Amino acid sequence: MAPQQTGSRKRKASEVEQGAGTSSLPGRAAAAAGTGQADGPLLLAKRPRRPVARRSLVHYLKGRALGADGHPGVAGFEGDLRSYGVLRLPELLRERQLTLGPLNKVFASQWLNARQVVCGTKCNTLFVVDVQTGRITRIPLMRDRGPGQTRAQPTCGIHAIQLNPSKTLLATGGENPNSLAVYQLPTLDPVCLGDRQGHRDWIFAIAWMSDTVAVSGSRDGTVALWRVDSDMFNGSIPWHNNSGIPRYSHIRPRDMEAIPRATTNPGNRKVRALAFSGRNQELGAVSLDGYFHLWKARSSLSRLLSLRLPYCRENVCLTYCDELSLYAVGSQSHVSFLDPRQRQQNIKPLCSREGGTGVRSLSFYQHIITVGTGHGSLLFYDIRAQKFLEERASASPDSFLGRTGRKLKLTCGRGWLNQDELWVNYFGGTEEFPNALYTHCYNWPEMKLFVGGGPLPSGLHGNYAGLWS
């Protein structure tokens, strides 16, 4: 298929990569650093005494920050601390807010590297933020080919951003929120746009099945399977025309499936979230009519089952844990756990108890699930113990004292709120307005957490972004 010329301007790759300048030491620089020779005679040094490895996550983190990765005792200790660190990290995290200017509500986010996070907002802005400097680089959105196609809808936004397993491609929405846009990493050059015979309404969710196959879920009640041809990004197709304008292919889905209509709420079968099981090669989906759907995902989609969820209001987020073969669904007041292979679910739903503001984002890591609420807080639930993580009796992070019985909760800062007429007339000029945490993503090697969101009421304009480390 011949690529089509578009009106999107080329960005210099250096603009996006500039923020990652200190994230890793180049190979030649590392080699040069290790070839220095000492002046004067060589002395026979005494064998250094082996330091005692201190069994504390705090000491490990401090040692790693000082470059002690190869320190005796630390290398073996790192594996032992991995599971323990998952439990202790939440209580060690401290917030640093990031300034995003007048952008409206961060809906989606993913780490690109140790310093950069790519985000999508309600105001249809795709940008990369350097979490160290705070610098923001906007990424031009891809445009549909036909002049009669739907253009940007600023009230919709970019609801999904996903990286493929090898982190060489990024999938998100286009200028038309119905279209699937794919960019190459790390340069964020445009690769292709799924704007032909695809969705008729906004894309709410994206999941990668492999490095070249992605699935999108839409508000029109359909799930589409897309394949990205390697010729589109391996250099066999010219990137630009003579004017320097980037070219990208316009593709159509390889398969499309509509979710079944529910008898209880047939008009609200919008696909809200997707999660892929690599182990089982299955795709899970949540629709706003209160159902969970499961497909066998190969070269096409074959629906296996549809289940009525125990809590069916505002099912807006879904995640999957390969280790536990378990899906987690967030709703208005609960997180429900589903194992499609079990008739009787053994894990009871957890209640967020956050004033009915709902669960807005979920993520699994090992046996801990992180819950972002609509009331500006992060909660942490241990699946094995089937209880929330609790605060410690001592403020010292090195303490091994008992728990207080109080739920461990991280409360996010105020962010920025546009104090316009709507805010004054309908919300009484309330100064303290909690932010809904629509997205969060971990950088586990660096033990950092990025959180994004904004005010929960749809009419309010504002944003929140924070780095927890």
From Swiss-Prot:
Classification lineage: Eukaryota, Metazoa, Chordata, Craniata, Vertebrata
Protein name: DDB1- and CUL4-associated factor 12-like protein 2
Pfam families: Beta-prop_DCAF12
UniProt KW Ubl conjugation keyword: no
The WD repeat ranges on this chain: 153-193, 198-236, 266-305, 354-391
Organism, as annotated: Mus musculus
Disordered, as annotated region: 1-34
SMART domains registered for this protein in UniProt: WD40
InterPro entries according to UniProt: Beta-prop_DCAF12, DCAF12, WD40/YVTN_repeat-like_dom_sf, WD40_repeat_dom_sf, WD40_rpt
Similarity field: Belongs to the WD repeat DCAF12 family.
KW Transmembrane helix (keyword) present: no
Residues of the signal peptide: none
Top-level taxon: Eukaryota
Keywords of this entry: Repeat, WD repeat
Annotated PROSITE patterns: WD_REPEATS_2 (PS50082), WD_REPEATS_REGION (PS50294)
